[in-house]
Amino acid sequence: MTKKEKELFKSLCSFKENTFDKKLLSAATPNVLGHLFFNRMQATAYGTLKKHGLAGAVNREFANSLKAAYERNIEKNRDFFTCVRYLGEILSDCGDKYAMLKGAYLCRVYPEGCRTSNDIDLLVKPEDVTEIGNRLSSAGFKQGNIRNGEFKAASRREIIESKMTRGETVPYIKEVGLPAMRFLEVDINFSLDYKPGDTGLVCEMINNAVTEEFDDLRVRTLRRDDFFIHLCSHLYKEATTLPWVEMMRDMTAYKYADIYLLLSDADREQTERLFERARELGTEKICAFAVIETSRLFKLDNSYAAAAAEEILKDDPEFIRTVISPNDKKKYIFTEKDIVKRFFAKNRKVLLKEAGSIENA
């Protein structure tokens, strides 16, 4: 991509910005369009154009492709929020044992049509995973995955291995038959990492959970600072794990957009509290990682957050370039230091060099 194409991509993704450089629209190429869809930012991009009154100022095919995705998101979210309410009813007397994550809350916070979700993620205390799972099973959910548009049940081995090695269960799925959502998928997480070893932290977050109320929706979710830290931890887990790099799913922009949204809405005092909470939980480096990468990929109007993150990692410059392979316990380092160049690379795996084992990291 050309420099101008990259700038247009960045501007279209930065939906919280109050200004937009119209000169960038001449770079509205199929290349930019492809990157928007690849990074699941197509609806957000249309929302940005609409916000600035520029939907009619860009190539028609470019705009119409984004508009279709935007309108589809609005339709899908109607069904998604129906599913959030339905799940809340199933778990109505389990309030102190879980919190809904990511899309269940964020889809209501984003501008309309700019974000949707394919599933509902739950954070559950490890000792309550079986109870929550039983509630879902009693409501008609089955464990498995969607393959080629159809449900495929998980084997007992897959169910056990997921709980033992991934810190999450095999998804619980039910066919709900809504116009824009045929299946409802619920993912139960009981760890912030692939290894189910941070149970104390998970329990503390759930004990501090809050209920966010909207006009037509109540969502039990994590407290704002813990919600931010969970997003950062989830992003870090995927961005620094070799299989995700190999699949080119390690730096998908929509994940950074969530952090961009929360940081854009936070003033300095609120940002300081986020980092203070991260230090309490021992996740300050992970949060710094997410903030630094987000500040490079979006036009983030929170200079304090970026500066604070840089300060946290100043003595560990390799932290933001480290990738691990859980299978063979190897450690890798990105040879390309520029985050934006890594993001737009066609194959990030070739930018890695082996750097010892995890035990020696």
For the regions a protein language model found, what residue spans apply to each?
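Conserved NTP-donor binding/palm subdomain of two-metal-ion nucleotidyltransferases/polymerases, i.e.
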Residues: M1-N118, V124-A361
